[in-house]
């Protein structure tokens, strides 16, 4: 699943790594490999500080589990269960992270569960974003609520949820703008949208998911923190993990934001969304580290 780890190890070693597994690796070499995965350095220090000079696969696995499962060091939150109908998902993230495509993927999952879905084109200042969501709606046969360019996105969110209530829709997915260059305005806009969602839902809970570009590495955390501070996010979906991603951002999100990673976007098709599996993630990372030379 996480082949990018093995690619990075091969690059660090300067040759195609053999499949034979090593029994241990020196701490300095392990540190170099983890840096190559684009895992932030303070996280690496925390992982390795209680380990010896030679580290076994089991020792690394246990250290990683402490971060992603919760230990005395940090408690990872789990996605809260919401039973409200319609179940509203407010989707946020910077432009280019893959919000619109991810919304289509989430809607496709909803359809597979025999649920009725509705989409809201809340990035009202970008005609291209609205058009893209409408095209996905046509492809998936899902209605898209939209408004004229430049309309108030909060009103769009309100109308989308009102329509969902009237039509007995199960799940709603609302797109949003992601103009971080105008950070203050964006934060105010997102806060207003969230308040509007709460109002029309009569204070019933709803999900706020961040779409994070996996190719950004640790630098994407700065963006993520802004959204989390603004909205108190419920979870993260990481995209573009089929390309140049180094994978380390996954650990960094768990470590820094203490938010669950829900799905991974592994391509551009509506089915290219897989549930994040912590055990498989750790297993693949450890396997890549201990590939023989």
UniProtKB/Swiss-Prot annotation:
Keywords: Cell inner membrane, Cell membrane, Cytoplasm, GTP-binding, Hydrolase, Membrane, Nucleotide-binding, Receptor. The lineage of its organism: Bacteria, Pseudomonadati, Campylobacterota, Epsilonproteobacteria, Campylobacterales. PANTHER family: SIGNAL RECOGNITION PARTICLE RECEPTOR SUBUNIT ALPHA. One of its GO terms (biological process) is protein targeting. Its main location: membrane. It comes from Helicobacter pylori (strain ATCC 700392 / 26695) (Campylobacter pylori). GTP binds at residues 93-100, 175-179, 239-242. It is an enzyme of class 3 (hydrolase). It is a peripheral membrane protein. The gene is ftsY. This is Signal recognition particle receptor FtsY. GO terms for cellular component: cytoplasm; plasma membrane.
């Amino acid at each position: 699943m996480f082949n990018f780890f093995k690619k990075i190890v091969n690059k660090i070693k300067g040759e195609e790594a053999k499949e034979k597994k090593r029994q241990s690796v020196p701490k300095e070499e392990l540190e170099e490999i983890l840096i190559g995965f684009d895992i932030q350095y303070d996280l690496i220090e925390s992982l390795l500080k209680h380990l010896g000079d030679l580290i076994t696969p089991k020792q690394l696995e246990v250290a990683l589990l402490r971060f992603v499962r919760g230990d005395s060091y940090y408690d990872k939150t789990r996605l809260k269960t919401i039973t409200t109908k319609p179940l509203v998902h407010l989707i946020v993230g910077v432009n280019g992270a893959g919000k619109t495509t991810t919304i289509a993927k989430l809607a496709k999952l909803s359809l597979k569960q025999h649920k009725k879905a509705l989409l809201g084109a809340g990035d009202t200042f970008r005609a291209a974003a609205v058009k893209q969501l409408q095209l996905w709606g046509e492809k998936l046969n899902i209605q898209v609520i939209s408004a004229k360019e430049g309309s108030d996105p909060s009103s769009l969110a309100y109308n989308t949820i009102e329509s969902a209530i009237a039509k007995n829709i199960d799940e709603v997915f609302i797109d949003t703008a992601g103009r971080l260059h105008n950070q203050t305005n964006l934060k105010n806009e997102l806060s207003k949208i969230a308040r509007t969602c709460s109002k029309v839902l009569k204070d019933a809970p709803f999900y706020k998911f961040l779409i994070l570009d996996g190719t950004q590495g640790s630098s994407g955390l700065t963006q993520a923190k802004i959204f989390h501070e603004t909205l108190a996010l419920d979870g993260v979906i990481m995209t573009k993990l089929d390309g140049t991603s180094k994978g380390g951002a996954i650990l960094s999100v768990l470590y820094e934001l203490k938010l669950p990673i829900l799905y991974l976007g592994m391509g551009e098709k509506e089915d290219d969304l897989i549930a994040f599996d912590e055990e498989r993630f750790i297993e693949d990372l450890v396997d890549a580290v201990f590939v023989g030379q």
